[in-house]
Structures are given as C-alpha cells and as structure tokens.
Amino acid sequence: MLHTEIYGLNNKHTIASFFAGVGGIELGFEQTNDFKAVYANEVDKNAQITYQTNFPEINLDIRDIKEVEATEVPKVDIVTGGFPCQAFSIAGYRKGFEDERGDLFFELLRVIKENRPKVIFIENVKNMVTHDKGNTFKVIRESLVANGYYIKWKVLNGKDYGNIPQNRERIYVVGFNNKETYDAFEFPEPVEMTTELSDIIDYNSQEDEKYYYREGKQPFYDKIEEAVISYDTVYQWRRQYVRENKSGVVPTLTANMGTGGHNVPLVYTKNGVRKLTPRETFNAQGYPEEYKLPELANSHLYKQAGNSVVVPVIKRIAENISDVLSKHDVDDAMNIQDANYALVYTDLQGNYAGESYTHDYYNSYEEAEAALDQIDDRFPLIHDTEYMELVRKRKSMKFYSIVQL
C-alpha cells in the first residue's frame, strides 16, 4: 500500500503517532484544536483497548512497528513518538541501546526518513540525555539532524510547565524540516502551579476496599500506619520503608506502581490509608474527566498511566508548534544530499536543553573540516570523547561535529 496524501485535514495539521500508548500525546495536540491524529501505532494489547475506547475514529495499527512499511504510513505534517522509556530510564536498569527496545528509535527514524514530515516530536525520560555517558542521546540527535531536521530539546517538569501536581521530568525533542520555523519556535515558559492534590485526589470518598491498607491485610502495615499520617501529601511505599513527598505533589508515577507493592503512591484519607486509584493516577497526568478507562485489570491501568505523558505539557508545546507553523509554514526543507559526512552545529545548554542542526553535507571528512575553517571560527570542532566530557560535567558549549552518514 502506498502513502495516502492527507496533509492539512480540514485545515488542521495531521499527526501520525508511534508508540502511541493510550494516546496522551495526540490528546494534548488535539486539545489545541489545531491538530488531528489520523494514524497511530501501538503493539500493546491492553493499551490498544484504552486507545480505541477514546479514539475510535483513528486508524490504530496494532502491528509491531518493525512490520510496518514506511510507505504504508499516511503522509502527515507531524510524526510523534514516545518510544518505550524503559530502554533509557533508570527504572529500566540503564540498558540503553543494548536493550532491543532501544533499537525502536531507528524504526521511528525509518518512517521519518521516508515520510519527511514538517515536524517531529519525541517525548522520553530525562535520563536519555545522560545515558551511556551521553552517547544514547548523541546518536538520536545526530541521526535526526543528519537527516535534515533542525531540533531543539528541553527537560520540563510537569509541575512547573503543566500546572499538574506531579514531579515528572521528561525530555521533549521538537524538530522542524526548515530553519525558519525552527528559529521561531520556543518551548513554553514555566507557569505557577495552582492545581492542588485535592483537585486530583478525592480524600473524602469511600473507594473500593481493595485500595486500602488495613491491619492484618499487609505484613508491613505497622510501618505504613506509623508513617502515613498527614493529609495533603503523598507517600510512597519503597519495599522496606515509607517515603514522604514533602513538596506537595505526587512522586513520579512509574509503570510498575501497580505490581509487587513497590513504588505505590499512598494517601491518608478520611477512610484510612489507601493507594491512588487508577483514575487518580490518570488525573495526575492531566487527563480530563471525560477520558474513559476501560474494564481492565488495575495493574494494566496503573502501567498505562505510569508509561504515559503529562497531557497539559504536551498541549502547551503543541500550541507553540501551531503558532510557528501558522506564521512560518514554508516548504523549503533542507535538500538532503547524497554525501558521506554532515557538518553539525550544536548549542549544548547543560544537560537539560539545547539545539542542533546540520550546516551542510560533504563528500569527505577533510572537506567538512576545511569548510568549517571558512564559515565559523568562533566555535570549535569537537570529537566524541570531548562531547562525553561535556555531558559528564554538565557543561554548556556551542560547537561543531562531523557526523559520518
């Protein structure tokens, strides 16, 4: 099957979403009323149920992305991807590209190279920036810019940028296929958090008894009873002890918070100590009340919430993307040449933000090196070991690198 041309559906920018999960990224984009998801890919069977419950009109492709031909994906304006975070996160044991799930980025890149969307959007765990001494993100960054994308990235916390009481830091990568929109785009500014825990957690309701911790029900109940004593805070059972989150927000939700009694957020309520309900964990990610949770085991719903995104942060970034597309939507993508090397400019702003793009393409390393002498002597040419040292020391620097294609 060949591409379906569906640019600008009903004057809205179209989206193809990969590793779609339960649809948090497209939900945030669609809340702006400027975007419409027309294709999504998700292989997890339980996530598929939740996705289709809430997005019945979207063509959900349930195959493994490795089985999807790039030519089968509709031609869209934006390709989004939140490839499995376990391959990069501390919680996923720091496996990185040694884990086969890390290879899924290259499957996403395969689709991007074929479809050439105007915008790419990636969300992942904060640790992706520093994983493997910085090499993991270096590969991702260089792969995107070598294929003609001008990218900016920044680590944002949901409580600071989404007005959501959850401590959730994630890296957001936005890429454009032309420099004009890239230059105009900025990440949103921080906002005051006015949403309180009581807005997402019902401390007065009587929930199903299965959510409560009772004497004789859990072998560690005495530790919980002693530690969990205050309203308006969230605790976390950490296998052997209780950790109190004193910042007035929910600790970072994880995919395993519903299994094994570990990483479970706990609250002190009118009716006793209990864990958050699945609905409350989705609330903590900024999902609206009308978002439907299907009849699935709670363990699946907890996993889906823990793997998902902070919807209001996605929406705020999407608003800025929409703004630059409306003002600078020009079709002058970089001409990707049949060359062997790319001369790449990077502005590394510590480990938490930056931007990068390809200056030009060359047939040999020597040509790229000679070109740098002609175009810019302010910023040095650095090599992999020097880059790793910058990441290790969390330093900021503007520099060039030569990437073999």
Where are these regions (language model features)?
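Short aromatic-glycine-(Arg/Gly/Cys) micro-motifs in beta-strand/loop hairpins
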Residues: 335-357
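C-terminal target-recognition/interaction regions appended to catalytic cores
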Residues: 216-333
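A short, exposed loop/beta-hairpin motif centered on an aromatic-Gly-Thr core
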Residues: 352-369
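Short acidic, glycine/proline-rich loop/turn micro-motifs
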Residues: 90-94, 264-267, 298, 355-356
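Core alpha/beta nucleotide-donor-binding catalytic domains of modification enzymes
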Residues: 2-119, 126-130, 135-138
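Short, mixed-charge low-complexity intrinsically disordered segments
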Residues: 373-405
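Class I S-adenosyl-L-methionine
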Residues: 30, 48-52, 68-76, 86-252, ...
